[in-house]
Amino acid sequence: MTIKFLSESTINRIAAGEVIERPASVVKELVENAVDASSTKIDIILERAGKNLIIISDDGIGMTDKELEIAVERHTTSKFDESDFLNINTFGFRGEALPSIAAISKMLITSKKRDADKAFQIKLIGGNEKQVTISVHNEGTKIEIRDLFFATPARLKFLRADKTELAATVGVVKKIALAHPKISFSLTHDGKNLLKLKGQNKDAETNLKQRIIDVIGDDFIKNAAYIDFKTPDFSICGYTSSPTYNRASSEDQFLFINNRPVKDKLLQIALRVAYQDYLARDRYPICAIFLQINPQLVDVNVHPAKAEVRFHDPDYVRNLLIEAIKNALTNKSHVTSTTIASDALELFKNPLVNKQSPVSKVINVNSKSADYRPTTHSILNTVPQNHVCQKLIDTLSHAKIEQEVENRIEHEQQIRKQYKLGAAKAQLHTTYIISQTEDSIVITDQHAAHKRLGYEKIKDYLKTEELIKQRLLIPEIVELPNEKKADCLYDHREKLYKLGLTLEKFGEKSIIVTEIPNILGDVNVQKLIQDLADHLSDFGKNIALTELIEHVTETYACHYSIRAGRKLSADEMNALLRQMENTLLSGQCNHGRPTYIELKLKDIERLFGR
């Protein structure tokens, strides 16, 4: 077969295959054009998820009849100066979208230039039969796309169900709307309004916050940390969720480069690294993060749909994003998700009561931190009625007892006012600490809370020096389930030695432990080694040192922490609460689960109809 030039229509159809994959691709290209046209209002209408009809209307600068004719030709644009290709600040710049869409659909464009007397219309069928006529239209542009992919029927077979295609389109519109809070957006499907976003005209931070509330939801903002980070060539702003407010997938992560929505692996990895101390590996944060960077330091022309970018210095960008997110999380480090308390209150409204089960015992706190305002009579009644105690009571004046009560109450009130997590009141099921503040009660998971404290303590210690070791009086022999796990621990013995563990191989499946980290105290060595083996065997020999330290620190923290089922005194409970208040990121354990929930008094009163 001889080599020949392709026809213009064939070239356009090939280009369409790269740029236009589904109705959402059409909506993306046309809405971005409307944004570039300085629109303040953009309306989208769909039928059958865009397969039958897509209409995009805007109030932008519009086009003349001559511009209409040129706009539907390949590689024509008004958006940048070709002499300055490195400074691209618009969504579009290749001049491919309109001719590519026209080549595979029936297109009708109606436009009126601002302050012009007439509107004009151009009609194309499969990219051909171009007809420009005078029309009637308001200022701006309306583009109608009918019978998408009629000219490439094979592509129709690859489209998903209407519901799936519609969801993709809604996602595209939401991303663009997030980046442009000053623009009003509406989206209608088969006559039903799906999205109506009002343009905001306040300061930039307020505009962004309101648009995020409208698109992602008010719950997200309540459970998110604000990011504000700047360098001479770089700025990052937006919101990222508290670790306890997370999802099972990364679908709710919105990332932008110079207001362009991207799905960039570098940024996603940076996000994962920033949260690695706070989230389990199968959970994902929610975020809307906007990176503004000098256009000369980023290449947006590396992907047909411009979904990916290439940075001049990717490591620099990655490290800055990690630092920005960690700084934001640190500022919100003691806060746990508000939705957790709401969910708990909902359960109280509809309790599942088992009438056969006995009421669990609650251990009351009888110390200076108790918030029970007893009378003299009630105190005397709680004292055992034996001869020694009775004789002691007889020697005490009522005035002294009442003074002790007043001192106790005053001390309690000071704690409730001074400390965020309040004063410990009781221990529930020997697992949860109940404390009281001025306007709420706080329920703390003692194991999760102490595990976070231990994790941070061990991690900080490892940054400066090796862990101090304690030699076991009798070396511990740990038998593991298989040889692979024993070999894995032995392969990492030198690294583990720096982390406080001294071990040797003992037979095929056993490890002998002679030294452990002093910080762990009287730890169950068998369980510690088995847990470490489980963690590390999945990675083999190639695990990086930083990742090894992460896994070891997590395992140490788990064995260092107070276990559920251990009774705590009032002093121990209050000491734990005070440590939490002074430790960063104490609102969640390192798997993203909350360490405490707070129930406001007003919400509790509402449960009782007060």
Swiss-Prot record:
Organism from which the protein derives: Rickettsia rickettsii (strain Iowa)
GO biological process entries: mismatch repair
Stated role: This protein is involved in the repair of mismatches in DNA. It is required for dam-dependent methyl-directed DNA mismatch repair. May act as a 'molecular matchmaker', a protein that promotes the formation of a stable complex between two or more DNA-binding proteins in an ATP-dependent manner without itself being part of a final effector complex.
Family: Belongs to the DNA mismatch repair MutL/HexB family.
Superkingdom as given in the UniProt entry: Bacteria
Keyword DNA repair assigned: yes
GO CC list: mismatch repair complex
Keywords: DNA damage, DNA repair
A molecular function GO annotation: mismatched DNA binding
Gene field: mutL
InterPro entries per record: DNA_mismatch_repair_CS, DNA_mismatch_repair_MutL, DNA_mismatch_S5_2-like, HATPase_C_sf, MutL/Mlh/PMS, MutL/Mlh/Pms-like, MutL_C, MutL_C_dimsub
HAMAP family, sorted: DNA_mis_repair (MF_00149)
Protein name: DNA mismatch repair protein MutL
